[in-house]
Amino acid sequence: MTWKLTKSEMDPESLLVNESLLSLGNGYLGVRGNFEEGYSTEYSSIRGAYINAFHDNVEITYGEKLYGFPDTQQKILNVIDSQGIQIHVEDELFSLFTGEVLSYERNLHMDAGFSERIIHWKSPKGKKVKLHFKRLVSFAIKELFAIDVEITPLDNIQHITILSTINGDVSNFIDKEDPRVASGHSKRLHVSEVRQEDDISIIKNTAYTTKLEVTCATTTHITSKHHEYESQRIENGIEERYICTGSDSIHFAKYNVYTDTLRHGEKVSEQAVSIQRQLKALAFEDLLQEQRRYLDDFWKVSDVEIDGDAELQEGIRFNLYQLLQSVGKDPASNIAAKGLSGEGYEGHYFWDTEIYIFPVFLMTNPEIAKNLLLHRYSILDSARERAKTLGHEKGALFPWRTITGAESSAFFPAGTAQYHISADIAYSFIQYYLVTKDEEFLKDYAAEMLFETARLWADTGHRVNGRFRIDDVTGPDEYTCIVNNNYYTNAMAKYNLLWAAEIHQLLKEQDAPSLKRLEERLNLTVDEVKDWQDAGDNMYLPYDESLKINAQDDSFLQKSRWNLADTPKEKFPLLLHYHPLTLYRHQVCKQADTILAHFLLEDQQDLETIKNSYDYYEKITTHDSSLSSCVHSIMASKLGYEQKAYDYFNETARLDLENTHKNTKDGLHMANMGGTWLSIVYGFAGLRIKESGPSLAPTLPKKWNSYTFHMQYQGRVIKVHKARGSVSYQVVEGEGLSILHNENSVYLETGREVTIS
């Protein structure tokens, strides 16, 4: 069933991967899919709960530290563990690693918003029980993580004991061999409060340096004819014990409420207790109904239906669901590279948000997209300070990786040097304006962001023979660092500069008083705006006459080509097996670079150049980055390479489900998940957002019968259905509009389906 991810075998070798796959979250709180009872000692677990943006600052140690290197980096923290539930069947501890597992089923219900384990277990002494665990992280009450357990004795069992714990002694996972995972600073929280207030158990943790606080307040409830209860404080936690006698079924519920300083202010424990008291009247079934209502609304617009391939249908729904679970829904947070499913990349926000994830929400849930932009706006002052540190008198340089605005990248060649992130962020603000026409947002936030990022480019580049050039930067391809005139960077900077000038003119015509106030606040002059226009108009975009392609940068095509065909499979990803300088000296791409620019800014080049460039760069791309395959799928669709488009899409759709990059244990690949949706909507369906409106050119993979999706545009919901030999469009909400279908204008009247054969 494509609405349900099922694991029907208890495979010990897949435990860590399944912890990520079966994680739960709501954008504020995330919990990995651990077993409540834990594992046997021979198996490791990354047991985790995370609050989006809740972090500590840790010192960066350099062998040689130079000016401008960050002193510290931010790190998402594994917070208080409230998952613990141990079950004793008489005197035998329930464990899937002892006795006999008679049947096992584990499900993630993506339409209903909960996960479950259904187990028939025979103890070493022969006692049989059925255990049904359900858990959810509430979309309606963002602070709530709830667990429900039903225990059914299948034999004459005298007593069952349930031991529930909350543990404040937690630490982060480290891996010294993988640069994508933290290598130190595992413990960054100390327990600052342990107490009980009536029936509520309370633990508070405080971060070492930021002094941010997090509280978990827990209540438990049992339905059993005969039971005894006791609780006690243990070291760094609280333990509750229920001893149930008789052979009747037992129902146990555990509600865990998390609050933190960033959202709840200084009185985090009082806030957690208050929320707990409001939950008393809510049964677990009530919470499930709230989940279903929320998800019905989400899937109504966000679902992508594929007729013809159940595995890929499961893949796209799983990826969209995990994006929803991880994306921040308040301006205090964004979406981390691994979301809230794990600790890879230390909970940092990258350009992944703007280029791969933001478009999904922009076209389906624009309010969520707006919050992502508001988070970037909230760190604008930090970006201004970072620009000054890098020697720029004006402008905003956004951090390559961050949580609350400070640069957290210690390796500047593949970090700070990726100046393109500022243009990527500007690009997302422009796309938001085109899709929503939110004039107030433009005046209050977007214009300032565009002006400050344009200032960065004007100060970074210089003119040679009338052409505007940008030196010593790194593009998306991290196997090629510190180059002059990276095509992607220059093309995105050009877009940024020209749109900043255009928005300045637009505000001058439509709301001159607002513009004047902004100019005065920024000390912005007319000469600066003219300089943006000139720099954009005269931006140098590398082009090779002999190959008739856009050169990735000034020196890339002069390098020796890496022999990918003869590189042993065990040497991938290359970054784990070759020194960076070895990679930098070759023509080899970690991911799409020039090809990505041609996707985002296809109007800047003719189709022949785009095709030639794709053919050239695809041959030397390793796809070591999970951000690569989706872009190659999208552009293969545009160029008519149907099989390539489909094959690359396959890679994106099930990358985590199949653990193809071998690091899903550290968390799910959020950008790739966004890329799955992009591969269908921007790839197969050919969607582009033009200034004139939506433009589509739908194609259908040979193996499919049809696909259907919805998109939002300027207050409308538009349904797109592509079948064999035809495509239909319908405005299901909002006013009618004109769209482009294969470059031809088509008017869509509200409620009337238009079918084109």
PLM segments and residue spans:
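Beta-sandwich/jelly-roll carbohydrate-recognition scaffolds of carbohydrate-active enzymes
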Residues: 2-314
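C-terminal capping/lid segments that line or modulate ligand- or cofactor-binding pockets
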Residues: 16-50, 356, 404-405, 480-507, ...
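Non-catalytic C-terminal accessory modules of carbohydrate-active enzymes
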Residues: 71-124, 130, 607-611, 618, ...
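Structural helix-adjacent loops and short alpha-helical linkers that scaffold large soluble proteins
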Residues: 306-313, 328-331, 363-373, 433-448, ...
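Helix-terminus loop motifs that line ligand-binding clefts
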Residues: 327-341, 367-427, 433-434, 440-442, ...
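Carbohydrate-binding/catalytic loop surfaces
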Residues: 337-348, 392-415, 467-486, 554-556, ...
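Active-site core of glycosidic bond-cleaving carbohydrate-active enzymes
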Residues: 349-378, 505, 521-665
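Acidic/histidine-rich catalytic neighborhood
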Residues: 456-524
